[in-house]
């Protein structure tokens, strides 16, 4: 019974600590947005200036710098912030909310551009796929057809070849040789009859 009573109050202080942490300062993302709004720099505010503002205006823990970096990255990925200079968490950042009407137009333009850019890519990919596919299909299908036809076509194929070959090759010798002997024999027979 005593163990349960001691474990229950132990959980309460943890909740209290959590509530204290939440009451000390707002979310890091909110603080970053507030810092950028307070600076109102057209070129955008740097991460260092954002950190200075947050540390001076809010009670923040020791890991504030890493939390600010993470929140800046999240805000950039979600589209709340625009990165004007630099890469990642370094560089300068602006609020994208102030450019909402421009952003909506920009989004429409970018979507159209993406569609325009995507359609040629899609068109080129199917062309490549189509060019590859027909080459693959004829390679694969003729083999199958050839195998199936081999049973039937060899007879058909041999017949036309042999028929063409025999009349051309055999007709000349047969006609040439038999005609000559017939002519000779007929001449001999005619001579004998005379």
From Swiss-Prot:
UniProt feature, compositional bias: Low complexity: 1-11
PTM: ADP-ribosylated on Ser-104 in response to DNA damage.
PROSITE patterns tied to this protein: H15
GO cellular component: nucleosome; nucleus
Residue ranges, annotated region (Disordered): 1-29, 84-194
Start and end residues of each H15 domain: 24-97
GO molecular function: double-stranded DNA binding; nucleosomal DNA binding; structural constituent of chromatin
Gene Ontology biological process: chromosome condensation; negative regulation of DNA recombination; nucleosome assembly
Residue runs in coiled coils: none
Keywords: Acetylation, ADP-ribosylation, Chromosome, Citrullination, DNA-binding, Nucleus
Residues bearing the modification Citrulline: 42
Main location: nucleus
Modification type N-acetylthreonine: residues: 2
ADP-ribosylserine: residues bearing it: 104
Cellular compartment(s): Nucleus; Chromosome
Modified residue annotations for N-acetylmethionine: 1
Keyword Nucleus: yes
Comp. bias intervals (Basic residues): 105-194
Function noted in UniProt: Histones H1 are necessary for the condensation of nucleosome chains into higher-order structures. The histones H1.0 are found in cells that are in terminal stages of differentiation or that have low rates of cell division.
Family of this protein: Belongs to the histone H1/H5 family.
Protein name: Histone H1.0
Species annotation: Pongo abelii (Sumatran orangutan)
């Amino acid at each position: 019974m005593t163990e349960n009573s001691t474990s229950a109050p132990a959980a309460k202080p943890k909740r209290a600590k959590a509530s204290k942490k939440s009451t000390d300062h707002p979310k890091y993302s909110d603080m970053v947005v507030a810092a950028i709004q307070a600076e109102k720099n057209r070129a955008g505010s740097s991460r260092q200036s954002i950190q200075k503002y947050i540390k001076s205006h809010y009670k923040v823990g020791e890991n504030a710098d890493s939390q600010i970096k993470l929140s800046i990255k999240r805000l950039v990925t979600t589209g709340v912030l625009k990165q004007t200079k630099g890469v990642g968490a370094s560089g300068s950042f602006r609020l994208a909310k102030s450019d909402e009407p421009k952003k909506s137009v920009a989004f429409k333009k970018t979507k159209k551009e993406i569609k325009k850019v995507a359609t040629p890519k899609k068109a080129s990919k199917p062309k490549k796929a189509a060019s590859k596919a027909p080459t693959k299909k004829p390679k694969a299908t003729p083999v199958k057809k050839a195998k199936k036809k081999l049973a039937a076509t060899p007879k058909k194929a041999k017949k036309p070849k042999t028929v063409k070959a025999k009349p051309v090759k055999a007709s000349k010798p047969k006609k040439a040789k038999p005609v000559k002997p017939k002519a000779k024999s007929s001449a001999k027979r005619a001579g004998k009859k005379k």
